[in-house]
Amino acid sequence: RDRSVSRGLGDVYKRQQYDGTGPDCIRVCFHKSQALQAVELCRKIKDKGYKVYFQPMVALSYSDAEYLGLIGMANKFRPDVFYIVDSHGSMKQKDVARFFYLIENNLDKEIAVGFHSHNNLQLSYSNAQYLAALHTDHNLIIDSSIMGMGRGAGNLNTELFVEYLNETADADYSTEPILCSIDNTIAPIYLTTSWGYSLSG
């Protein structure tokens, strides 16, 4: 059995009801073949009082009909966030638009929309800008990491995206703590465990 969705299940099933302390959300990532198993897991997590971030990996592997089926299941068990996941960093803007509008027109408005991207084609930043500019009736969550820290090609850079939001969306994020984190913590890690675009794979 693929371990992606089952990793850590023992901890989930052993967890007591959420008591208001510690992490309050659990991210459930799964491949298409694991959708029913993932939905059942999400229900159990919700029953224990945790928030659920529903992340069907490799969105591009789904047809419109299959993705609409996922949305229909989500409308029934009601995760806190339904994610568009670009696992291979291969989404172009037209792909982001396709999945966004399937969600926008069919997902319950009380469920937030998330976007989790990898940066293989160096499009995480432009795709995030595109999403942020769209009108939506949902709350929108866009994942990022400082200095793009992440597996393989890495993820959307927090320091770039918050500056973009400050300039275009009347946001008021302070970039100084982020830059200090880069200098003091993240950059030294990068020297020994690098990530990012590479022709050598």
What are these regions (language model features)?
Residues D2-Y13:
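Single conserved hydrophobic/aromatic residue that forms the stacking wall/gate
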Residues D11-Q17, D64-G72, S124-A128:
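Short, acidic/polar
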Residues K14-P23, V39-G49, I71-R78, E104-L107:
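Acidic (Asp/Glu)-rich catalytic clusters
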Residues D24-A35, Q55-L60, V81-M91, G114-H116:
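Catalytic beta/alpha-barrel core
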Residues R27, Y53-F54, L140-S144:
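Short hydrophobic alpha-helical runs that function as membrane-insertion/retention elements
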Residues H31-K48, L60-Y67, G89-I103, A153-T158:
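Active-site-adjacent beta->alpha loops and helix N-cap segments on the catalytic face
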Residues V81, V85-T192:
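Catalytic alpha/beta core domains of metabolic enzymes, predominantly
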Residues T193-G201:
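C-terminal extensions of enzymes
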